[in-house]
Amino acid sequence: MTMHREPGGERYYYTWAWFEGPDDAAWRVTGHHTDSGEQYRLDWNLAERSLCVTDSLGRTRCHWWDAQGLVTAYRDEAGQMTTFRWSDEERLLLGMTDAQGGKWRYVYDRLGHLTETHDPLGRVEQTQWHPVWHQPETEVDAAGAAWRYEYDERGNLQAVSDPLHQRTVYGYDRHGQVVRITDARGGDKYLQWNEDGQLMRHTDCSGSQTAWFYDERTRLERVTDAESNSTRYSYDGNGHLTEVMFADGRTERYQPDAAGRLVKYTSPAGQITRWQRDGQGRVRRQTDATGRRTAYEYDAYGRLTTLTNENGESYRFRYDVLDRLTEQTDPGGSRRVYGYNALNAVTAVIYGGERGGEIRHGLERDAAGRLTAKITPETRTKYRYDAADRLLEIRRRQHDAAEGGEPEVIRFSYDSAGNLLSEETAQGVLQHRYDVQGNRTETQMPDGRTLRYLYYGSGHLQQINLGRDVISEFTRDHLHREVQRS
């Protein structure tokens, strides 16, 4: 193949050459370009088992592989290296060193199941596997919290127990499709499927039912909710959605182009929004119902370079060699500049005013990419986490604070399932309690008063009270939507 054309009209071209190496001999792509201006040169060195790809901007990325074709190293366009280490016999990934130098290590059982993941911080996540079904039996996160899984005689997931030993149970039909879900509270949900494996009916814990109907081509034709309201869907000959008719008679219409991409939308009020697209499907212009236009410009590699809004004001964007946004300029000339680390996480944001001057915010991160400190011209804020990446403490100090002055501190604690249990500040402690479904049921305030939340069904908020006083009550319809608040 030397050329193919997408439905939108964009053409893609390829050049080839014959290569013979120590592992194989084959035709390989040596060049690639598109109508919109993308250009790539592919340089193969089969003796070294390497491939380098250079685009028209002069950016080059390279891969190296071993005799089995497994990638052993990757160098990105910024020159940053990522390396991979594989086992000799099973060819399992044993380790990876990321572009920042962080080392990841992987351990497997004798069947090749991943049992341990060690991250650059030394944290370990573990998995034990079912000996017959080769599905996880126990998963333990880096903080030691465990999720346990049970299976039936056909290998279907039968029950899940969370770190608080709260159990969710699943029932199946003869096709292995879930037909019943029993939550930790004992509430049941029921599902019914057709012979094509499509959901036909859902009955929630309150007995409310939603039904789905399909046409002979298995396309969704109608949805009838628990209030007996039906929404209907229509399609063109290619299966693209063209119309949605709601229960009250309102209609939305959609017009796709030959490639199935939306180019026109008509609202129930008859207001029309149009989109003009290029050969690759990118929106070039959007025109709303009042005739106002928003325009989008891209470079040859699909990066948004200019956005011109309805008032004719333009926002401009610049990128680095890794396609990361590095600068944004608004219509008034104000600039925002971004810096990144080797893991592509933002490490600096510089705000530039239209009259000059800059404000810099620095962001420090650990080897796992978590934000550990934010430095502004006025303050330094530190963040501390537990092994499961839950935020434990925020500590903020003014740069001009007196020697020995106390910083502002907020502390958090959690249960093993990740529910927030307490929030502590200088003003006191908020303490929270939850039901078996993870819904917050109580918040005790620093003055000793307790805010309580009452639910029904699978967690629909019904009442909030403070002591003996009702703060608010909620009335809901059969779809559990709030219809009245008092």
Residues covered by each model-derived region:
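Extended charged/polar low-complexity repeat regions
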Residues: 1-486
